[in-house]
Amino acid sequence: MKSLFVAGTGTDLGKTHVACALLEAARAGGLSVDAFKPVVSGFDPDAPDDSDPARLARALGRPEAWTDVSPRRYRAPLAPNIAARLEGDTLQMDDLITDCREWLIGRDVGLALIEGAGGVMSPMTDEATNLDLMVALGLPVLLVAGSYLGTASHLLTALEVLRARGLSIAAIVVSESLDAPDLDQTLGLLRAFEHQATILSAPRAGNWDAGSLVDLLMA
């Protein structure tokens, strides 16, 4: 089983967009897949179909499985620890790690994705960040960046931090940002500074085919 952690250089850059496209392309290629997002904030229980868990569940071909995809769901569109506190919960990193490990143990699929919340250093609990969860799990990272002005600094900083903590980068996907500079120009800039991991792009126009990403990750 190929297991990956889908992380972002920031918030709302397209992690779920990339993860869904990857899952759909993998399924189209005959792979069995599953996905897990251990905690999500900004979740409206009255409109679950628009949520990240529901999008991932649809990409899995199991649209009713969003409760399994994300067992910890909070309403407020804030950092998970703050959103949880508003509902009387306190998130603990040990619990999130256990959730992810138990989920991984129970999988028997070709490709399993765990998607984080926010960016690499986004707080997950009152004392720990997304990075702490990633380090504890030790999975290769599929890193998603935007194409906005300033993304080079954010991406290179994230790569430096991830590698300093011993994490490997499976691939980098640049998810096209709205009203951003030319995508190809941005890709050229990023590739001039990052020579280890393959950088692919995920255009927003049309339906992005992630088949090349599947081939790269499963090789």
Curated annotation (Swiss-Prot):
Keyword Nucleotide-binding part of the UniProt annotation: yes
GO biological process: biotin biosynthetic process
A Gene Ontology term for the protein's cellular component: cytosol
EC identifiers of the protein: 6.3.3.3
Active site: 37
Residues where Mg(2+) binds: 16, 52, 115
Record's function text: Catalyzes a mechanistically unusual reaction, the ATP-dependent insertion of CO2 between the N7 and N8 nitrogen atoms of 7,8-diaminopelargonic acid (DAPA, also called 7,8-diammoniononanoate) to form a ureido ring.
NCBIfam families membership: bioD
Record-linked PANTHER family: DETHIOBIOTIN SYNTHETASE (PTHR43210:SF5)
Record-given protein name: ATP-dependent dethiobiotin synthetase BioD
Organism: Caulobacter vibrioides (strain NA1000 / CB15N) (Caulobacter crescentus)
Protein's gene: bioD
